[in-house]
């Protein structure tokens, strides 16, 4: 069985390196897509992403959950990491997403094909995941990069949580960076000690050159949404936080490229509050720049 799994992973990597494989070319893509050995975060929660883009596997006896798919060219690496940990891609039943930009959603369609999982997303994110195209209201719509669309995308609608194999993941709506941004909270346990795990969406006020967070008709509630999202994350019970970009929660100050490190150092109930506070400082600077844009040299 193990031999067959190794062959399956090898074929995945070969597929990902063929000329026809989906891929996006951007200034940071190679850096983001550097390989990173998978590792256990805590209990049934594992890091299976690349060095620059997070993807998290949460396992249960009744099927697994995968959060985020990174770039299109990241999908073979993520699938390889799942198998390296001793799990099967075909046991992934649900794929979730933080937000629909190409560096977090680009690999979801391929991961769905490899697993047969359904994709569940916020109502405002579902269509972008189906089409691989951002809604015009997205602050980065003018600099978007298209990616393969997924099938069987199920909107969250009004559900406050989803359940897979006895695991409950609470929905934390965190719009602002995108209109449909979503963070997720669940519990993982080790030796009877259960911790609140949070996969945090981006809270940064990043956009194309024309968008204004202080007020823009394409997304008039962007400022209010982002501020409310910061408050929501700050108020979330949070023992371990994994950011959609791993360096945002200092993951690589703890783990090396081989996935070795002191997992206990990840446990920090102040992380969510600190992330929200840092995002607010960045947002205040962004709003100041919009009020007083730098003068263009003649």
Give residue spans per PLM region.
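Divalent metal-coordination and catalytic microenvironments
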Residues: 44, 58, 68, 99, ...
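Active-site environment of divalent metal-dependent phosphoester hydrolases
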Residues: 36, 74, 100-106, 126-129, ...
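Conserved beta-strand hairpin/beta-sheet module of binuclear metal-dependent hydrolase folds
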Residues: 31-85, 89, 183-205
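Bacterial N-terminal signal peptides that target proteins for export
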Residues: 1-8
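Accessory terminal helices/loops
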Residues: 22-31, 191-193, 205-298
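Active-site HxH/HxHxD metal-binding segment of metal-dependent hydrolases
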Residues: 73-76, 83-161, 260-261, 265-268, ...
């Amino acid at each position: 069985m193990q031999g067959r799994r190794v062959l399956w992973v090898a074929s995945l990597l070969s597929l990902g390196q063929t000329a026809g494989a989906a891929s996006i070319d951007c200034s940071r893509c190679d850096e983001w897509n550097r390989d990173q050995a998978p590792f256990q975060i805590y209990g049934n929660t594992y890091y299976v992403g690349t060095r620059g883009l997070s993807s998290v596997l949460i396992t249960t006896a009744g099927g697994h959950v995968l959060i985020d798919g990174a770039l299109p060219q990241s999908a073979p690496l993520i699938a390889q990491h799942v198998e390296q940990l001793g799990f099967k891609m075909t046991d992934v039943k649900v794929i979730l997403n933080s937000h629909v930009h190409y560096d977090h959603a680009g690999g979801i369609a391929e991961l769905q094909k490899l697993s047969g999982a359904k994709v569940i997303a916020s109502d405002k994110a579902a269509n972008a995941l189906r089409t691989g195209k951002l809604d015009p209201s997205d602050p980065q719509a003018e600099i978007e990069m298209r990616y393969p669309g997924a099938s069987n995308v199920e909107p969250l609608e009004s559900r406050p949580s989803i359940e897979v194999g006895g695991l409950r993941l609470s929905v934390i709506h965190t719009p602002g960076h995108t209109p449909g941004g979503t963070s997720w909270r669940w519990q993982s346990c080790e030796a009877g000690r259960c911790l609140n795990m949070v996969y945090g969406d981006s809270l940064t006020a990043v956009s194309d050159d024309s968008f204004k967070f202080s007020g823009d008709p394409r997304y008039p509630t962007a400022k209010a949404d982002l501020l409310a999202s910061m408050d929501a994350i700050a108020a979330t019970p949070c023992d371990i936080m994994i950011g959609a970009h791993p360096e945002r929660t200092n993951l690589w100050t703890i783990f090396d490229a081989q996935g070795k490190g002191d997992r206990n150092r990840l446990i920090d109930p102040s992380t969510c509050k600190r992330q929200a506070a840092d995002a607010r400082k960045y947002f205040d600077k962004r709003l100041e720049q919009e009020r007083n844009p730098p003068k263009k040299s003649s």
